[in-house]
């Protein structure tokens, strides 16, 4: 049984790190897509007429 003073399992540390990175990337993607600079984004398919 683990107590709060014992070291956590390395697998838990790796899982929390991966989860934090994925959440950060998701947040950055949403901020890029819908944030204040999103008005400057253009769609290259709409800009190119054939």
Curated annotation (Swiss-Prot):
Q: Where in the cell is it found?
A: Cellular thylakoid membrane
Q: Which InterPro entries match?
A: PSII_PsbN (IPR003398)
Presence of the UniProt keyword Transmembrane helix in the record:
yes
Report the GO terms under cellular component. plasma membrane-derived thylakoid membrane
Q: Topologically, how does it sit relative to the membrane?
A: Single-pass membrane protein
- Report TM segments: 14-34
According to its UniProt entry, one GO biological process term is: photosynthesis
- The yes or no answer to whether the keyword Transcription is present is no
Q: Which UniProt keywords apply?
A: Membrane, Thylakoid, Transmembrane, Transmembrane helix
- According to its UniProt entry, what is the function of this protein? May play a role in photosystem I and II biogenesis.
Q: Which family does it belong to?
A: Belongs to the PsbN family.
Q: What is this protein called?
A: Protein PsbN
Which gene holds the coding sequence for this protein? psbN
């Amino acid at each position: 049984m683990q107590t709060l003073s014992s070291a956590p399992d390395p697998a838990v540390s790796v899982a929390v790190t991966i989860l934090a990175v994925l959440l950060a990337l998701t947040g950055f993607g949403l901020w890029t897509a819908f944030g204040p600079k999103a008005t400057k984004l253009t769609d290259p398919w709409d800009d190119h007429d054939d």
